[in-house]
C-alpha cells in the first residue's frame, strides 16, 4: 500500500473525533493579515471554511482589511495614524473604511466562499442593526492622556437574531467590522473586537483569530518563546503591566471578551501557514496559542 495514501487515511482518522465534537457548533473566525493578501493563503482559508461547513459546523467570519484601507487612504492623500493599535478615524477615513471593508473586501470573501459551494452572505454591522456601536473613549497607554480617535467605536450590543436565522438556514455570515451608532452614524470597530463580541453573543464553541504571528510569545522578540496555552488571568496581568504593544492589545482583549461571554476556547494562530485553520481545529497538536479561562 502506498505510504502517502496511508498517511492521508491517518489524517482523516485523527480528524474524526473533532468532527464529531464540533458538528452543529458555532465557530467564529477572525480573518485578517497575510491570509487575506496572498492568493494561495486566501484560497486555503476559503477551503478550510468550506470544509468546516460541510462537516456540520456553523462558521461565522469577521474580516479585517486594514492594509487595504491604509493603501486607499494614502492614494487619497491621507496618511494613516494609529494609537495603541487602533486606527484614528476622521470622517474621510470612515468613508474610506466603508468603501473598502463593505464595498470591496466583504464582496470578495463572499465570492470566494460561494465558489467553494458555500452559501455565504455578506453583512456589515449596520445591516439589521447587527452591531450597535458607541464612541470609543481612549486613554493613551503611553501618556495616560485621553486621545480623540474620531469615529472609532466599541461594541455596545450584538443583535444575534439575524446571525441565528442565517446559520440555522445553512448560510455562512461574512461580517465587515462597521457598527452603527445613534442617528445611524457608522463607526469603525477593530475587527478583533467585533469577533470577540460576536463569539460571546452567539455563545460560540470557539473563536479563532488568524494573524501574522505564530501566537503569543513569552518574549515578543524571541520566536522560540511561543506559548501554546495561556490563561485569561495571565492576559489581564500583561495588559495591566503594559507588557503588550500595538495590534496584540485588541487581540488579547477580544479573547477576554469572548471567554467572559461563555466561549470555551480562543485560538490565536498564524494565518501565514497554509490550512492553519484546519490544523488548529482538526488535529491533536493544533497550532498557535490557546487562551482559556
Swiss-Prot record:
GO cellular component: cytoplasm
Site (Transition state stabilizer): 30, 251
Catalytic activity, EC: 2.7.2.8
Listed Gene3D superfamilies: Acetylglutamate kinase-like
Protein location: Cytoplasm
GO biological process terms held by the UniProt record: arginine biosynthetic process via ornithine; L-arginine biosynthetic process
Function: Catalyzes the ATP-dependent phosphorylation of N-acetyl-L-glutamate.
Pfam families for this protein: AA_kinase (PF00696)
Catalysis performed (reactions): N-acetyl-L-glutamate + ATP = N-acetyl-L-glutamyl 5-phosphate + ADP
Protein's name in the database: Acetylglutamate kinase
HAMAP family: ArgB (MF_00082)
Chain residues that bind substrate: 65-66, 87, 188
Amino acid at each position: 500500500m502506498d505510504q502517502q495514501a496511508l498517511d492521508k487515511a491517518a489524517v482523516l482518522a485523527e480528524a474524526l473525533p473533532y468532527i464529531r465534537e464540533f458538528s452543529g457548533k458555532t465557530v467564529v473566525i477572525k480573518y485578517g493579515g497575510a491570509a487575506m493578501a496572498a492568493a494561495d493563503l486566501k484560497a486555503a482559508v476559503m477551503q478550510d471554511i468550506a470544509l468546516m461547513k460541510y462537516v456540520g459546523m456553523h462558521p461565522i467570519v469577521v474580516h479585517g482589511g486594514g492594509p487595504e484601507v491604509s493603501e486607499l487612504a494614502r492614494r487619497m492623500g491621507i496618511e494613516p495614524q494609529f494609537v495603541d493599535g487602533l486606527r484614528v478615524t476622521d470622517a474621510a477615513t470612515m468613508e474610506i473604511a466603508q468603501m473598502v471593508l463593505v464595498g470591496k473586501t466583504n464582496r470578495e470573501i463572499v465570492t470566494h466562499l460561494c465558489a467553494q459551494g458555500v452559501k455565504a452572505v455578506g453583512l456589515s454591522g449596520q445591516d439589521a442593526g447587527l452591531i450597535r456601536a458607541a464612541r470609543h473613549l481612549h486613554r493613551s497607554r503611553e501618556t495616560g492622556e485621553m486621545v480623540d480617535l474620531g469615529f472609532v467605536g466599541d461594541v455596545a450590543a450584538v443583535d444575534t437574531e439575524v446571525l441565528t436565522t442565517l446559520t440555522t438556514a445553512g448560510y455562512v455570515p461574512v461580517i465587515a467590522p462597521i457598527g452603527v451608532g445613534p442617528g445611524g452614524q457608522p463607526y469603525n470597530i477593530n475587527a478583533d473586537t467585533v469577533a470577540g463580541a460576536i463569539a460571546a453573543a452567539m455563545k460560540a464553541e470557539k473563536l479563532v483569530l488568524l494573524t501574522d504571528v505564530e501566537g503569543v510569545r513569552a518574549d515578543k522578540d524571541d520566536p522560540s518563546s511561543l506559548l501554546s496555552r495561556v490563561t485569561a488571568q495571565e492576559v489581564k496581568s500583561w495588559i495591566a503591566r503594559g507588557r503588550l504593544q500595538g495590534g496584540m492589545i485588541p487581540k488579547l482583549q477580544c479573547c477576554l471578551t469572548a471567554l467572559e461571554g461563555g466561549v470555551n476556547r480562543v485560538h490565536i494562530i498564524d494565518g501565514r501557514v497554509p490550512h492553519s485553520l484546519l490544523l488548529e481545529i482538526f488535529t491533536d497538536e493544533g497550532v498557535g496559542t490557546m487562551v482559556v479561562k
